[in-house]
Amino acid sequence: LRVVVLLGPPGSGKGTLATSLSEHLGVAVFVTGDALRAAIDAKSKLGEKVKADVEAGRLVDDETILALAQEFLAAHPEGVLFDGFPRTTRQAAGLRSLVSAEDDLHVIYLDASEETITSRLTSRRVCPGCGEIYNMRFKPPKKDGVCDNCSTTLIRRKDDTEEVIRDRYQVYLRETAPLVDYFARELLRVDGNLSGDKVLERIRGELCPA
Protein backbone atom coordinates (compact mmCIF):
# COMPACT_ATOMS: atom_id res chain seq x y z
CA LEU A 1 0.00 0.00 0.00
CA ARG A 2 1.38 3.39 -0.99
CA VAL A 3 0.55 6.21 1.44
CA VAL A 4 1.54 9.81 0.72
CA VAL A 5 1.00 12.68 3.17
CA LEU A 6 1.04 16.27 1.86
CA LEU A 7 1.82 18.97 4.40
CA GLY A 8 2.15 22.68 3.72
CA PRO A 9 0.71 26.07 4.64
CA PRO A 10 -2.38 27.53 2.94
CA GLY A 11 -1.33 28.71 -0.51
CA SER A 12 1.59 26.30 -0.83
CA GLY A 13 -0.16 24.50 -3.70
CA LYS A 14 -1.25 21.33 -1.88
CA GLY A 15 -4.63 21.07 -3.60
CA THR A 16 -3.28 21.41 -7.14
CA LEU A 17 -0.36 19.11 -6.39
CA ALA A 18 -2.65 16.51 -4.80
CA THR A 19 -4.68 16.27 -8.00
CA SER A 20 -1.65 15.98 -10.30
CA LEU A 21 0.31 13.63 -8.06
CA SER A 22 -2.63 11.30 -7.35
CA GLU A 23 -3.26 10.92 -11.09
CA HIS A 24 0.41 10.14 -11.68
CA LEU A 25 0.63 7.61 -8.83
CA GLY A 26 -2.83 6.10 -9.37
CA VAL A 27 -3.94 6.67 -5.77
CA ALA A 28 -7.08 8.16 -4.19
CA VAL A 29 -7.08 11.57 -2.46
CA PHE A 30 -8.32 12.00 1.12
CA VAL A 31 -9.29 15.57 2.04
CA THR A 32 -10.66 15.87 5.57
CA GLY A 33 -13.46 18.31 4.70
CA ASP A 34 -14.61 16.17 1.78
CA ALA A 35 -14.52 13.03 3.93
CA LEU A 36 -16.63 14.71 6.62
CA ARG A 37 -19.23 15.84 4.08
CA ALA A 38 -19.32 12.38 2.49
CA ALA A 39 -19.89 10.75 5.89
CA ILE A 40 -22.76 13.14 6.64
CA ASP A 41 -24.35 12.55 3.22
CA ALA A 42 -24.06 8.77 3.68
CA LYS A 43 -25.96 9.06 7.00
CA SER A 44 -23.70 6.43 8.53
CA LYS A 45 -23.23 6.11 12.30
CA LEU A 46 -19.97 8.00 11.95
CA GLY A 47 -21.71 10.56 9.74
CA GLU A 48 -24.43 11.20 12.32
CA LYS A 49 -21.78 11.92 14.95
CA VAL A 50 -19.92 14.23 12.57
CA LYS A 51 -23.16 16.05 11.71
CA ALA A 52 -23.94 16.63 15.39
CA ASP A 53 -20.45 18.05 15.99
CA VAL A 54 -20.57 20.29 12.92
CA GLU A 55 -24.07 21.61 13.69
CA ALA A 56 -23.04 22.36 17.29
CA GLY A 57 -19.95 24.21 16.10
CA ARG A 58 -17.61 21.74 17.79
CA LEU A 59 -14.27 20.67 16.36
CA VAL A 60 -14.43 17.08 15.13
CA ASP A 61 -12.26 15.02 17.47
CA ASP A 62 -9.11 13.17 16.42
CA GLU A 63 -10.70 9.74 16.93
CA THR A 64 -13.45 10.51 14.43
CA ILE A 65 -11.02 11.90 11.85
CA LEU A 66 -8.85 8.80 12.26
CA ALA A 67 -11.88 6.54 11.86
CA LEU A 68 -12.66 8.30 8.56
CA ALA A 69 -9.05 7.89 7.45
CA GLN A 70 -9.13 4.19 8.37
CA GLU A 71 -12.33 3.65 6.36
CA PHE A 72 -10.81 5.47 3.38
CA LEU A 73 -7.61 3.40 3.51
CA ALA A 74 -9.62 0.17 3.64
CA ALA A 75 -11.69 1.28 0.64
CA HIS A 76 -8.63 2.18 -1.47
CA PRO A 77 -6.05 -0.64 -1.47
CA GLU A 78 -4.37 0.98 -4.50
CA GLY A 79 -3.04 3.68 -2.19
CA VAL A 80 -4.04 7.00 -0.65
CA LEU A 81 -2.74 10.56 -0.77
CA PHE A 82 -3.66 12.57 2.34
CA ASP A 83 -4.09 16.29 1.67
CA GLY A 84 -3.82 18.36 4.85
CA PHE A 85 -4.07 15.33 7.16
CA PRO A 86 -2.82 14.72 9.81
CA ARG A 87 -3.08 18.10 11.55
CA THR A 88 -1.97 17.03 15.04
CA THR A 89 0.70 14.69 16.40
CA ARG A 90 -2.10 12.55 17.84
CA GLN A 91 -3.56 12.14 14.34
CA ALA A 92 -0.04 11.47 13.03
CA ALA A 93 0.48 8.70 15.59
CA GLY A 94 -2.90 7.25 14.68
CA LEU A 95 -2.04 7.28 10.99
CA ARG A 96 1.28 5.58 11.65
CA SER A 97 -0.56 2.82 13.52
CA LEU A 98 -2.77 2.27 10.44
CA VAL A 99 0.23 1.89 8.13
CA SER A 100 2.19 -1.36 8.34
CA ALA A 101 5.96 -1.69 8.09
CA GLU A 102 5.53 -3.17 4.60
CA ASP A 103 3.58 -0.13 3.36
CA ASP A 104 5.28 2.63 1.39
CA LEU A 105 4.88 5.82 3.48
CA HIS A 106 6.07 9.21 2.20
CA VAL A 107 5.54 12.57 3.90
CA ILE A 108 6.01 15.63 1.68
CA TYR A 109 6.37 19.09 3.20
CA LEU A 110 5.88 22.03 0.83
CA ASP A 111 8.14 24.61 2.42
CA ALA A 112 6.98 27.97 1.04
CA SER A 113 7.95 31.39 2.40
CA GLU A 114 5.52 33.86 3.95
CA GLU A 115 6.11 36.26 1.04
CA THR A 116 5.30 33.58 -1.56
CA ILE A 117 2.14 32.53 0.27
CA THR A 118 0.96 36.13 0.67
CA SER A 119 1.59 36.92 -3.00
CA ARG A 120 -0.29 33.82 -4.16
CA LEU A 121 -3.32 34.16 -1.93
CA THR A 122 -3.88 37.90 -2.38
CA SER A 123 -4.00 37.15 -6.13
CA ARG A 124 -6.49 34.29 -5.72
CA ARG A 125 -10.03 34.58 -7.09
CA VAL A 126 -12.82 32.01 -6.72
CA CYS A 127 -15.91 31.26 -8.79
CA PRO A 128 -18.94 31.12 -6.45
CA GLY A 129 -20.83 29.25 -9.16
CA CYS A 130 -18.70 26.17 -9.85
CA GLY A 131 -15.87 26.52 -7.30
CA GLU A 132 -13.07 26.91 -9.86
CA ILE A 133 -10.02 28.69 -8.43
CA TYR A 134 -7.93 31.19 -10.38
CA ASN A 135 -4.79 33.17 -9.67
CA MET A 136 -4.62 36.55 -11.37
CA ARG A 137 -0.83 36.22 -11.69
CA PHE A 138 -0.30 32.56 -12.54
CA LYS A 139 -3.66 31.21 -13.76
CA PRO A 140 -5.90 34.11 -14.83
CA PRO A 141 -9.30 33.58 -16.49
CA LYS A 142 -9.53 34.13 -20.24
CA LYS A 143 -11.93 37.03 -19.67
CA ASP A 144 -10.96 39.36 -16.85
CA GLY A 145 -13.00 38.72 -13.69
CA VAL A 146 -15.24 36.04 -15.23
CA CYS A 147 -15.13 32.24 -14.82
CA ASP A 148 -14.10 30.30 -17.94
CA ASN A 149 -16.47 27.44 -17.07
CA CYS A 150 -19.76 29.12 -16.16
CA SER A 151 -19.28 32.87 -16.82
CA THR A 152 -19.96 33.73 -13.16
CA THR A 153 -18.25 36.85 -11.78
CA LEU A 154 -15.20 35.86 -9.74
CA ILE A 155 -14.84 36.92 -6.13
CA ARG A 156 -12.03 37.29 -3.62
CA ARG A 157 -12.42 35.36 -0.39
CA LYS A 158 -12.88 37.53 2.68
CA ASP A 159 -9.92 35.87 4.38
CA ASP A 160 -7.58 36.40 1.42
CA THR A 161 -6.28 39.69 2.82
CA GLU A 162 -2.61 40.21 3.60
CA GLU A 163 -3.15 40.58 7.36
CA VAL A 164 -5.25 37.42 7.66
CA ILE A 165 -2.93 35.42 5.39
CA ARG A 166 0.19 36.35 7.38
CA ASP A 167 -1.56 35.46 10.64
CA ARG A 168 -2.72 32.08 9.26
CA TYR A 169 0.80 31.37 8.04
CA GLN A 170 2.32 31.90 11.49
CA VAL A 171 -0.38 29.78 13.13
CA TYR A 172 0.25 27.01 10.61
CA LEU A 173 4.00 27.04 11.26
CA ARG A 174 3.43 26.74 15.02
CA GLU A 175 0.97 23.88 14.58
CA THR A 176 2.97 22.05 11.92
CA ALA A 177 6.44 22.21 13.46
CA PRO A 178 5.72 19.20 15.73
CA LEU A 179 4.47 17.20 12.71
CA VAL A 180 7.62 17.96 10.72
CA ASP A 181 9.68 16.68 13.66
CA TYR A 182 7.42 13.65 14.14
CA PHE A 183 7.80 12.54 10.53
CA ALA A 184 11.52 13.40 10.31
CA ARG A 185 12.40 9.87 9.13
CA GLU A 186 9.94 9.90 6.21
CA LEU A 187 9.98 13.63 5.45
CA LEU A 188 10.75 14.96 1.99
CA ARG A 189 11.11 18.74 2.20
CA VAL A 190 10.34 20.42 -1.14
CA ASP A 191 10.83 24.07 -2.06
CA GLY A 192 7.23 25.27 -2.27
CA ASN A 193 8.34 28.63 -3.70
CA LEU A 194 8.93 26.93 -7.05
CA SER A 195 6.27 26.66 -9.75
CA GLY A 196 3.78 23.81 -9.52
CA ASP A 197 5.38 22.00 -12.46
CA LYS A 198 8.83 22.10 -10.88
CA VAL A 199 7.49 20.92 -7.52
CA LEU A 200 5.70 18.00 -9.20
CA GLU A 201 8.83 17.12 -11.17
CA ARG A 202 10.94 17.07 -7.98
CA ILE A 203 8.47 14.86 -6.11
CA ARG A 204 7.99 12.47 -9.01
CA GLY A 205 11.77 12.11 -9.20
CA GLU A 206 11.89 11.12 -5.53
CA LEU A 207 8.86 8.81 -5.47
CA CYS A 208 9.26 7.27 -8.91
CA PRO A 209 13.00 7.24 -9.72
CA ALA A 210 13.82 6.04 -13.23
Feature names for model-found ranges:
Residues 1-210:
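Glycine-rich phosphate-binding loop of ATP-dependent small-molecule kinases
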